[in-house]
């Protein structure tokens, strides 16, 4: 529940969640990873999770890397189709075209200082430490832990062979609510991303596969943001 509560608490704030300096990002990563390691480690110890329950028994193979890239592309295409379809339905319901497209995009500037991405060192941190560790590893461990926990708490619903797939739904919703600062379009998009990443986790029964796909998805987003900012000036920090 904590990611959702933190996301809701930041709704409407103007500053980006990620600091706009290299030092700030390193400090934030250190604090966040330390707190998460302590909290997740304690929870895993109390719950006595097995490695298999967290999908940590499948090693990374060389083909895991290109496959993760392919999954990240598929996720991006899928989310694009979801948003485009939602736009079409909204226009059909309204009976007229929606001209204010800025209101129909995730507010990524609430997560990261887009102007700071012009700094090569800052961008490098986003593409590596933030994408694959702070976001990828941490959030996929959280997802695997939540699925395992739901299976323990409600085995009739979330246990057995298909239960973890049903558990993806509430876990993805919590994941989306953790991105509330991006607006409700961002919540919908990240909920869809959460479903996709959870499906990768369960399909391959491999946490590393999901971490890599998550990391490549985020890294591509950060790499494209400076270019997109030239097309959408509102992305630039005030």
Where do the model's predicted regions map?
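Structural signal for the C-terminal ends of transmembrane alpha-helices
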Residues: 41-51, 154, 200-203
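Short alpha-helical transmembrane interface motifs in multi-pass membrane proteins
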Residues: 20-24, 35-36, 67, 130-131, ...
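Membrane-embedded alpha-helical segments of multi-pass transporters/permeases
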Residues: 37, 41, 84, 222-226
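Helix-to-loop transition at the C-terminal end of transmembrane segments
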Residues: 4-9, 81-97
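Alpha-helical transmembrane segments in multi-pass membrane proteins
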Residues: 1-48, 102-105
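Transmembrane helix-loop-helix hairpins at the membrane interface
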Residues: 77, 81, 107-238
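Interfacial transmembrane-helix boundary/kink motif in multi-pass membrane proteins
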Residues: 1, 16-26, 49-89, 152-166
